A protein has these predicted regions:
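Conserved glycine-rich
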Residues: 98, 102-105
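Short helix N-cap motif at coil->helix boundaries in the Bergerat
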Residues: 61-69
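Detector for a conserved hydrophobic position within an alpha-helical segment of the HATPase_c
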Residues: 93-94
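A residue-level detector for a conserved hydrophobic packing site
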Residues: 8-9
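ATP-lid-like helix-loop hinge signature
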Residues: 20-49, 105-110
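Conserved polar catalytic motif of the HATPase_c/GHKL fold
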Residues: 13-21
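Conserved micro-motifs of the catalytic ATP-binding
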Residues: 3, 28, 77
């Protein structure tokens, strides 16, 4: 499966915008206004090889009832919100066979931020033509393997 970089960029921009608005609404001092974007390759038994993108903010977090409904069409907590951003993000990620989730961050019982993360599976097939051919003894030899997969 190919990843559409424009669509993934759209998801990241939406999550970053939401994080910035959360920090703004929390009226935090400048020293606590942080947003972290991380991109980490991972491998899990459940998901296999994937890339995890995460956006973490130090805003007020999300109430449970918002987390339960935030992907619904036209659901918004913002007075001027259309309620399509997170639903669109989820559709984009799922169209790439990925998953998206949100979680509050805690310091003891207090919510100290929110983290949105999504994963996109990575499929790196190894073309047979890139392997060194076996010689008559069954050894692979000492040649150099070349990746002959076509790139767009």
């Amino acid at each position: 499966m190919r990843v559409d970089p424009i669509l993934i960029e759209q998801v990241l921009l939406n999550l970053l915008k939401n994080a910035a608005e959360a920090i703004d609404n929390a009226a935090l001092p400048p020293s606590r206004r942080h947003i972290e974007l991380r991109v980490v390759p991972k491998h899990t038994a459940e998901l296999g090889a994937n890339i995890e993108f995460s956006v973490t903010d130090m805003g007020p977090g999300l109430p449970v009832e918002v987390i339960e409904r935030m992907y619904e069409a036209f659901f918004s907590t913002k007075a001027d919100g259309l309620g399509i951003g997170l639903g669109l993000c989820r559709s984009i990620i799922e169209s790439h066979q990925g998953r998206i989730r949100a979680e509050n961050l805690y310091n003891g019982p207090s919510i100290v931020g929110c983290r949105f993360a999504f994963t996109i599976p990575v499929d790196i097939p190894r073309p047979e033509s890139s392997l060194a051919p076996l010689d008559k003894s069954g050894d692979a030899g000492t040649g150099t393997a070349h990746n002959t997969a076509a790139t767009p």
